Amino acid sequence: MSKVLYIKANIKLEGVSRTFQVSDHFIEEYKKQHPEDEVVVLDLYKENIDFLRPEDLEAMADINDETKKNTTFLKYAFQFAEADKYVIAAPMWNLGSPAILKAYFDYITITGITFHYTAEGPKGLLQNKKAVHIVARGGEYGNAPYEMGDRYVKTILGFLGVSDIQTIAIENLDIIGADVEAKVKEGKEKAGLVAKEF
């Protein structure tokens, strides 16, 4: 049995968010194919993920039984490390991802939990895991330099040791005359195919 962490990083409501329309469909199809797996939903806005404070940095520098017990945000790092698969639903906002997703990655990028330092430099501890990033974009931003959200997600996951990473992107949703319904439907179809093999 695998544990799937479904990370939702969008303040828009269910049914309104085009990203969530596709990511929720992905999860539905995944559950059909993998009924024995556990899916844990983590809505970053409902969790009130915040920016790191000075005391958080101090706790990161000295992780022991006391800091594990008294440092609330560390639970997210342990939760992330314990998952086998990650579904990250985050739209493109202003060429990147919502700031709350970056804040979340700051919570979970913890020495000794998700990566560590070796004589050769940092090494990710999250080996043999896989991820899919589902993103809706207003225009066509699939390539650099304007696209910085998906590239960041892939880079930070790679830093943590996750090497099997896919992207499901729904683009050109805000272009004048775009058939948004058809594009979302196309995104759902792609999501369904990826979910079967995920």
UniProtKB/Swiss-Prot annotation:
InterPro entries: Flavodoxin_fold (IPR003680), Flavoprotein-like_sf (IPR029039), FMN-dep_NADH:Q_OxRdtase_AzoR1 (IPR050104), NADH:quinone_OxRdtase_FMN_depd (IPR023048). GO terms for molecular function: electron transfer activity; FMN binding; oxidoreductase activity, acting on NAD(P)H as acceptor; oxidoreductase activity, acting on NAD(P)H, quinone or similar compound as acceptor. It catalyses: 2 a quinone + NADH + H(+) = 2 a 1,4-benzosemiquinone + NAD(+); N,N-dimethyl-1,4-phenylenediamine + anthranilate + 2 NAD(+) = 2-(4-dimethylaminophenyl)diazenylbenzoate + 2 NADH + 2 H(+). Gene3D superfamilies: 3.40.50.360. It comes from the Bacteria. Its EC number is 1.6.5.-, 1.7.1.17. Keywords: Flavoprotein, FMN, NAD, Oxidoreductase. It holds the Pfam family Flavodoxin_2. The keyword Iron-sulfur does not apply. Homodimer. Belongs to the azoreductase type 1 family. This is FMN-dependent NADH:quinone oxidoreductase. It comes from Lachnoclostridium phytofermentans (strain ATCC 700394 / DSM 18823 / ISDg). The lineage of its organism: Bacteria, Bacillati, Bacillota, Clostridia, Lachnospirales. The gene is azoR.
